[in-house]
Amino acid sequence: MATAVVMNGELKKQPRPGKGGYQGRGLTEEEARVRAISEIVSTMIERSHRNENVDLNAIKTAACRKYGLARAPKLVEMIAALPDSERETLLPKLRAKPVRTASGIAVVAVMSKPHRCPHIATTGNICVYCPGGPDSDFEYSTQSYTGYEPTSMRAIRARYNPYVQARSRIDQLKRLGHSVDKVEFILMGGTFMSLPAEYRDFFIRNLHDALSGHTSANVEEAVAYSEHSATKCIGMTIETRPDYCLGPHLRQMLIYGCTRLEIGVQSTYEDVARDTNRGHTVAAVADCFCLAKDAGFKVVAHMMPDLPNVGVERDMESFKEFFESPSFRADGLKIYPTLVIRGTGLYELWKTGRYRNYPPEQLVDIVARILSMVPPWTRVYRVQRDIPMPLVTSGVEKGNLRELALARMDDLGLKCRDVRTREAGIQDIHHKIKPEQVELVRRDYTANEGWETFLSYEDTRQDILVGLLRLRKCGKNVTCPELMGKCSVVRELHVYGTAVPVHGRDADKLQHQGYGTLLMEEAERIARREHRSNKIGVISGVGTRHYYRKLGYELEGPYMVKHLL
């Protein structure tokens, strides 16, 4: 209960413990906070030793009420107070957003400096729905971003310095209790490959230097030091467009250490690409997919339902074609429902009544139906943009669209079988289910003028994915000399579960338990006996090259290569 005290002849009301103040007891607010943190950590240790359930929220609430704290201690403060002897046991209880490293990798998103969209020179304008960029209402933001997304705000605080962005984000994830031994960079902020070569080299060099701590003179030196750093760069993703994903661009991205491309497709209809001012054809998308996959890259496509002049039936047909046509069949997908944002051409159409978004409930139904079509070899990375809702004039109204769509699928008796939903780490976090009987599963399909084999270790009864490998028998679009002739290429090897250091082992975790080696052995067998290849290449992250050396591979250009007997 609140109490009243006399101060300077006036009655002052004291807040109740936990209701905006802190109890006296001769403690300052800072001292009360320190004692509360100490008590929270001590209680967690005691309950852990007694094998009792550690309910962090209940423990925090009790301590805050006891010491009258209006604001609960931050996770980073509690993590810092953990004794070294208890960190391994209690860190999972304190880790913020465990999903961030559930796939075994800490993702670090960085942004290049704001620059104009390259197709303005040919089409005279940007895409009709695209916010951001130097000429927009959000002038200090990069193209297609508003400057208010979490990654954008971190980039602006760092003044778009790549080293500061990377180092500060890695340190932040570490403070939040995540393992940062394996890092994947995602380069966002418009068409990176359209920027001058000098700036691109500066940007990539600083990303690798942020891991190694070395100050490099060029990209080659930065990559060489990054290969031996304690924090490994196991992959790099670059956002690009089909017209900046040709042979010379692909070669340069391989030198950077890039392993995955995110390509803006948006629609499989030529008329929609023209009407929205994309600046490229859908045929160009299919061509660049062929080139990228034959160079070994993983390909993630961006698709946008609810574009102007499409409608529900055409949207569903577009996604059906995307998943079933050999011209597309990307390895990953980001679904970005169309948003109306101030300052875009679409905003003007919306203001005059010439464009209207799907109603929210209908959009949830559409996304649910799209997710039910996803084949088991495709990973759905995102289901909506992370643009803050107050900046959205019309479109998605809630920030948990994936969750709503999955709930709708349950209602309709549908199931999502994409890679992310079935990952062992995600299943463990969301459903507390672990794989029991794991077996090798093989799926073959044609895509982009080549033959794809998707190998995986799965618990087929519980539908849990433990690890995967993407093997491709190269088609006729090979541009890299290292892969010419009778050659197969491993485009991805990934074992899921909470991150374990590259040379480490943890009996309770799936990484480094031998699944990767078994997948590589099967891939080599298929390449030798079925593809009739005399060489197999791997597009390897810079920091994982030592792993492949132990399997008998050698560095040849940007690839790890092994000659098959």
Curated annotation (Swiss-Prot):
Disruption phenotype: Slow growing rate associated with pale-green and downwardly curled narrow leaves and reduced root growth that results from a decreased cell division rate and a reduced apical dominance. Defect in tRNA wobble uridine modification. Filamentous leaves with abaxialized epidermis in AS2 defective plants. Acetyl-CoA binds at K182, E492, L493, H494, V495, Y515, G516, T517, Y548. Keywords: 4Fe-4S, Acyltransferase, Auxin signaling pathway, Cytoplasm, Iron, Iron-sulfur, Metal-binding, Nucleus, RNA-binding, S-adenosyl-L-methionine, Transferase, tRNA processing, tRNA-binding. Binds 1 [4Fe-4S] cluster. The cluster is coordinated with 3 cysteines and an exchangeable S-adenosyl-L-methionine. It catalyses: uridine(34) in tRNA + acetyl-CoA + S-adenosyl-L-methionine + H2O = 5-(carboxymethyl)uridine(34) in tRNA + 5'-deoxyadenosine + L-methionine + CoA + 2 H(+). The keyword Cytoplasm applies. SMART domains: Elp3. Pfam families: Acetyltransf_1 (PF00583), ELP3_N (PF23613), Radical_SAM (PF04055), Radical_SAM_C (PF16199). Residues 100-390 form the Radical SAM core domain. Changing E423K: In elo3-14; reduced tissue proliferation in the meristem. Its EC number is 2.3.1.311. GO terms for molecular function: 4 iron, 4 sulfur cluster binding; metal ion binding; tRNA binding; tRNA uridine(34) acetyltransferase activity. The keyword Kinase does not apply. Expressed in meristematic tissues of in roots, leaves, seedlings, cotyledons, floral buds and shoot apices. Expressed in the shoot meristem and the emerging leaves immediately after germination. In the root, expressed in the transition zone and the upper meristematic zone. Catalytic tRNA acetyltransferase subunit of the elongator complex which is required for multiple tRNA modifications, including mcm5U (5-methoxycarbonylmethyl uridine), mcm5s2U (5-methoxycarbonylmethyl-2-thiouridine), and ncm5U (5-carbamoylmethyl uridine). In the elongator complex, acts as a tRNA uridine(34) acetyltransferase by mediating formation of carboxymethyluridine in the wobble base at position 34 in tRNAs. Promotes organ development by modulating cell division rate. Required for auxin distribution or signaling. Required for meristem cell cycle activation at the time of germination. NCBIfam families: ELP3. This is Elongator complex protein 3. It comes from Arabidopsis thaliana (Mouse-ear cress).
